[in-house]
Amino acid sequence: MPTATLARLASDYLRQGQRLVARLDDAAYASPLPALSRSSVGAHLRHVMEHFTSLLDGAPTGIVDYDLRARDALLENNRSAAITALHSIERALAQDSMRRDCELLVLVDSGECGMRTRSRSSLQRELQFCIAHTVHHY
């Protein structure tokens, strides 16, 4: 699938998140739920948004590091902040630079051994990852 199509698809999924947030009250957004392994809708949505933000921040430099997420509690507890962030991510995905494939280097924490692995990737592949990750968390 072309990179531009993936960017549009990612925006479609983020708009689904916006619609969900708009339908929830503050307590429903931020409260832990047994069905979400004692996590909240807000925590899952923050996690999704921060993966997209990592990609958007790293793409211009050619280096993406998903482990450097901000883990911003405001996004998981404040619906207004989440909606603002979702709109911002959607606008960034619409930029021309996010519609043309390019090579990326993705840094990954390899786990217990403390090593960081560098993997060659592309904007197209990382958009696919972020979309699949979003579907998983929705």
Where are these regions (language model features)?
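Terminal, compositionally biased segments
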Residues: 1-4, 8, 12, 19, ...
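Alpha-helical bundle segments that constitute or directly flank the non-heme di-iron/ferroxidase center
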Residues: 1-26, 42-60
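Short, helix-capping/interhelical loops that line the mouth of catalytic, cofactor-
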Residues: 2-4, 50-95, 99-116
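Residue-level recognition of alpha-helical structural elements
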Residues: 3-6, 33, 37, 75-78, ...
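Amphipathic alpha-helix face/heptad-repeat signature
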Residues: 6-13, 41, 78-85, 130-133
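Charge-rich alpha-helical segments
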Residues: 7-14, 24, 38, 83, ...
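Short, contiguous alpha-helical
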Residues: 30-68, 114-138
